[in-house]
Amino acid sequence: MIKGKFLLTAVLALFLASCGDDEAPQGVDGAEVKFTAGFVPMQTAGADTRLTTNDNWAGLADRTVAIEIDGIVKPYTVDEMGNLTSSDPFYWGDKTELTVNAWYPYNEGVKLEIPVVKADQSGSGYWESDHLEVVTQDVPFSASDISFRHRNTQIVCDLSSTLPGVSYNNIIIKYLNLQNVEKGTVVRATAKGKALIVPQTITAGTEFMEVTLPDERTYTYILEEDLTLGQGIAKGVELEVSEGGINVTFKDLSSWDMSED
């Protein structure tokens, strides 16, 4: 009788152990891979500043980010503070370091070799044109931070006018003869003249900027020298409007304009 009790106890212990194994999380240690997404520094004329659009992940209609590990791509969701989680996550298993590629937008899990920006960026098209990437970053278990960088150039317009009644609210700014625009070669800027443009060099003698005033007068600016727009760079455009037309001066900015429009 005592021997039978010992046998029953042993069988019960094995059964409970097997149930525990079935319910254990995937991976050797069961740890789910989560990330915190930040941004890489931007180097412009010796300056070291944070490269951000709005300094966090707020305001996104589409919050799906692509994460690639060992050739497998999974969708992760990013919150306003950059925390990345997934309903079908990766697991650490027995690894202490992972090599990660990532990009935004998710684009059905396929990274565009060259980004394509929206033609009308006066509304949501501006944010929809902000392509981000992480390229082959080694991430240790102890610090799951990944650093995104912008793939485009940000154009920021600084308007001044000697004409009465001319302001950002009543002029239309367009950037012309651009590559990799979703429809055509023209980008309509935001209400404050900002735009995201695929990195490229535009040659001297090219019509680059069109400004339409409230009275429907339209002025076009032709580049006097080659204009190089690099990845992750913010380029300032000082636009002066007068009775005689427009004058444009370019300058490098030390950081991206983080305002909402």
Report the location of each language-model feature.
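Bacterial N-terminal signal peptides
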Residues: 9-15
